[in-house]
Structure formats: C-alpha cells, structure tokens
C-alpha cells in the first residue's frame, strides 16, 4: 500500500554518529556534547545514535556491549536540556544477513525499524536478494539510510516496492537533484531526515534550511 503521509518530524534526527568512541563519529564526550548542543539549537529534541555496525566484522552482542558503554558514558555527562538520546545502528548490508540472529536488537529504540546502509557501487543480484529477504521479515522494518547517495533508478524501484527511505538533511541544501528529493518526500516515501553528523562537520546548519523547505 502506498504511503500518503509526507510530513516529516524535524524534532527527530534519525541518523547521527554521536556516541563517543563507538565509531568515527565522535572522538570524545566533549565532541558528543557539542554535537548534541548543536542539535538542540536546531530545535531537535530527539537524536537517534546510529553507530556503524558491520556484520562481517563484529558480533551483535559485542556491538551492543560497546554501544551501551558509550551511551552510558555520554548520558552521565549530558545536561538536562540536551536532546533525548535513542539508540540504534547503521547496519551495513551483507550477503545472507537475513539469516542473522538478533537483528531486532539493532532497531531504533523500542521500534522495529532497522536503518540499513547499502553499498555505494552497483548492487549485485545477491545484495538485492538479501534486501528483499530482509523486507520480508516480520520482526523488522527496513529504513534505507541516506537514500540520496544511491542510484536513483535503484531507489525508484524501492519506492515502488514501498521501502521506507531516510535522507540526509544536507542533500536538500543543494539545488542539484533537490526536486527529486522533494518529490520523494511529497509522495511519502521519505520517512525520516538525519544529520548523519560525524565529528562537528557542518553541524546542523542544514536543518533550518530543511525546516523552511518543508514549511515546518
């Protein structure tokens, strides 16, 4: 069934690398505090921490242990006015990972949404097969990370197949291809925006531009 709700919650940053030392997104608690302060200034109330998870390199229990330790350290050092922190993961697709036990433990917070990263080369048949096998699982819902980075033809196919998309806010600040992304948003295919912040980068400067474009 085709989505019709095109409204995006800009108080939620769905994709952010803010856990200190958990991946290359933040090198310290101080960096993470600055990241979250910038999020708060952009009127973001909830940040979903989505450190990279590579199934071919690490087990799910090992990853979750590292993530929890990093999140605990950060929470102990946050001020009361900091955005709420949710835990998730940016999971790199691997051939056959639909058979991996424990995938729901990588979903965002208490939801069944799994943020899935695809390869940046042309997807071979085996990856397509894995993607569709993941979509058929009843215990998770796939959300495709930074969909603007992949082949438009592949994304259009996934839109027809009703796979939910996440866009990085930065892509809406550039005129090139913006019309395409706004069309995806208007037709309800884009479920979330994310900063995909690594270190301090450009912070959340794109967030206000997105807010104006989407008339929030």
Predicted regions mapped to residue ranges:
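An N-terminally biased module of ancient metal coordination in phosphate/nucleic-acid-related enzymes
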Residues: 1-82
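Active-site environment of divalent metal-dependent phosphoester hydrolases
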Residues: 54-57, 93-94, 148-153, 173-175, ...
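Extended substrate/RNA-proximal surfaces in nucleic-acid metabolism proteins
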Residues: 59-161, 166
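Short acidic/histidine-rich active-site segments
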Residues: 189-205
């Amino acid at each position: 069934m085709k989505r019709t709700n095109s409204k995006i919650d800009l108080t939620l940053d769905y994709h952010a690398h803010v856990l200190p030392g958990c991946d290359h997104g933040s090198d310290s608690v101080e960096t993470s505090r600055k990241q979250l302060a910038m999020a708060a200034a952009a009127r973001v109330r909830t940040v979903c921490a989505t450190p990279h998870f590579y199934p071919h390199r690490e087990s799910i229990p090992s990853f979750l242990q590292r993530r929890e330790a990093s999140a605990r350290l950060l929470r102990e050092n946050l001020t009361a006015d900091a955005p709420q922190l949710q835990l998730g993961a940016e999971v790199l697709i691997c051939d056959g990972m639909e058979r991996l036990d424990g995938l729901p433990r990588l979903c965002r917070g208490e939801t069944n949404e799994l943020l899935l990263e695809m390869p940046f080369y042309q997807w071979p048949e085996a990856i397509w097969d894995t993607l569709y096998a993941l979509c058929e699982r009843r215990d998770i819902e796939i959300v495709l990370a930074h969909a603007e980075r992949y082949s438009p033809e592949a994304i259009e196919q996934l839109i027809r197949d009703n796979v939910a998309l996440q866009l990085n806010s930065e892509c809406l600040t550039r005129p090139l291809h913006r019309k395409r992304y706004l069309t995806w948003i208007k037709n309800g295919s884009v479920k979330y925006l994310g900063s995909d912040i690594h270190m301090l980068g450009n912070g959340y400067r794109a967030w206000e531009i997105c807010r104006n474009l989407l008339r929030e």
